Amino acid sequence: FYTSAEKSQAHLNAGAKKVLISAPAKDETTPTVVFGVNHEILKASDNIVSAGSCTTNSMAAMVKLLNDKFGIKLGFMTTIHAYTGTQMILDGPRFPKARNNRAAAINTIPHSTGAAKAIGKVVPSVNGKLQGHAQRIQVPDGSVTELTTVLNKEVTADEINAAFKEAFSNTEYYGYNEDGIVSSDIIGDTHGGVFDPTQTDVNTVDGTTMARTVSFYDNEYGFTCNMIRTLLYFAEISE
């Protein structure tokens, strides 16, 4: 994969005008852009940009709103993620980690994710405050990100949901759905992520509030749609 500025330079050398990497960049200098969250940092002079990952896109708007409205002290995210093409169809020796060699369609497989680190490039004010993990599950598409955060303010679940409903009821890049959906319902959705208010939960003890918020996403199509929005904006400012 051409997932660093150094390797992506080959595309520019071959005649491409711009490069948008469809994965987290493996260097510290390439900007990471999620449309609707920080796409306005793009400049016409930028030549190589990362769109992050599907999981980064699913949670970026959620993280930014929580931080802007209530302040995030720290947090942990888990993506319950559809299996991907990098996994095994059948058990067999391929990867150094034994778990990664197990058949994807019949196992829940703990996996790493770079989304928590990448989110710090998209929302710099939370850089270093989040950690993350993935569970690859037995579905071919349709994923969900659970974000647990300790907030700076005391807040209720209703207040969190109201903030998300106001912000995202009518945006193309991030959605809001209170219909009690499941993972198959999200397949074909064009948003980078869809907030599910029915799963919001809050626990406040001695003035400290911990909140659980959830975002569904089509990890294939939804991510692609949001990446295309970034690409179109990139092209527009580069004309």
Q: Model regions: which residues?
A:
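Structured loop/turn residues at secondary-structure junctions
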Residues: 54, 111, 152, 218-219
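Alpha-helical elements of the RecA-like P-loop NTPase motor core of helicases
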Residues: 5-6, 60, 117, 158, ...
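Generic alpha-helical structural context detector
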Residues: 64, 121, 165, 229-232
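NAD(P)-dependent Rossmann-like dehydrogenase/reductase catalytic/cofactor-binding core
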Residues: 190-239
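C-terminal substrate-binding/catalytic lobe of Rossmann-fold NAD(P)-dependent oxidoreductases
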Residues: 71-74, 79-211
